[in-house]
Amino acid sequence: MASNKNRKVSRKKSRKKLWLAIGVIAIVVIVIGAYQVLGQSANQTPSPSATPTSSPSSSTDNEYTNSTKVLLQTSMGNITIELRNDMPITAGNFKSLVQKGTYNGTIFHRVIANFMIQGGDPTGTGYGDPSIPTIKDEFTSDNHNVRGTIAMANTGQPNSGSSQFFINVVDNSNRYASFDTSYPVFGKVVSGMDVVDNIASVATDANDRPLQNVTIISATILP
């Protein structure tokens, strides 16, 4: 009898140990799973919104009071840009190139969905036209590369901006730490953001060049 009782007690203890072990394993699995999920979220780099719904509208802020507007007639539709009046070097350079007809017949040579569309290079290569002088970097205290703004492109070196520009398709201010201190915003799209979005969605090759040219037929100063 004693032997039977001992076996029963032993089996009960074994079952308790088994359930205890299962419980511990379950807790460990849950904790590890939670840690992995939180870790992935914490390590994810913030990315621009892929579905922005609005673009900067014409405002009465000082930087756009009585400002110049430029019409880009492209092969995919018209885009109207309003230039900041507190960016005399950058906006002035863009306006001067428009008046000279520099942008007429150029293409958007670099297009990246959910990022930007880039154009303004008379050579169409992205290397730029060496005959066009570079300008000094110019930044305002509220330089933000948000959706719909137009900014000066450069080679990555100081004071290397020339004729190339890009239009932000999404909010790129947080794309990386120095984005807003690298690319000066000198205007914004006030009409035709749908055209910008359509250009941003065209098929491109491995170098982000559209498979079919998207051309700036003409760029003109609006009265």
Describe the function of each predicted region.
Residues 2-223:
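Cyclophilin-like peptidyl-prolyl cis-trans isomerases
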